[in-house]
Curated annotation (Swiss-Prot):
It holds the Pfam family CbiZ. It comes from Methanocaldococcus jannaschii (strain ATCC 43067 / DSM 2661 / JAL-1 / JCM 10045 / NBRC 100440). This is Uncharacterized protein MJ1613.
Amino acid sequence: MIEKVLEMDDWKAYKIPHTVEIDGMVEETKTLIIEFKNKRKVLSTREGFKEVKYVGNHSIPVPFWDKVHNYKDYENQVLNKIGIKKEDIALLSTGANMDNLAVAKEEFDEFYVVAFTTAGAKHNAIRLGDEEADYIEKDFKTYKIVDGKIVPKEEIGTVNIILITNANLTDGAMARAIITITEAKTNAFQELNIRSTKHPELQATGTGTDNIVVVKGFGSGVDYTGGHTKMGEMIAKAVKRSVIEALIKQDKIKI
């Protein structure tokens, strides 16, 4: 049965429960879908700019974390299960349980922003700029570096943030929003004192596999989404609250 999450004037969010299969093993899972009345322009850190009818976040079941060796085939299976074409959706994937989804909304004047976040930091929290990488990409394929050797490995996203606004953001404002979102996510990690997985003496700034989708609206135009603007403040507050809530839920953090 479809689970309602949130409904606005021209879009609605819901979770679709379904199954996925790998090598004869079948697992139950859920995919978050945000459906728009009219196509919207989005900026995804996975796919770049795209005009879509849907945005989604799929939860890869725990038993499949080390089994998704061909992500494109797996993604196609998910899309077939939920009945949406690839060109119509900006889809993210996560190892987090979709029941631990966090939603936060901020409003001011005619504007609103809503953040949908799944997050987990137990397995690959990292402090960027201070740690060595575990992976290398060659010809669009990802490989893990083990003892100086390259071996095939597919990694699963850990902190996924979908940010929706009714503001008509310029392309630059959408791109700048990614910086604001990232800073707010790091703020949340610091507030919860999330440590690097490999180097616990270091404060983590995020995980190595985080992704973001920014969705613009059809309201008044906005050209800047940095921290000195009300739009930037709203984005940051919604993201921070949702990241904190999602981490507490997924990682069972006690505060």
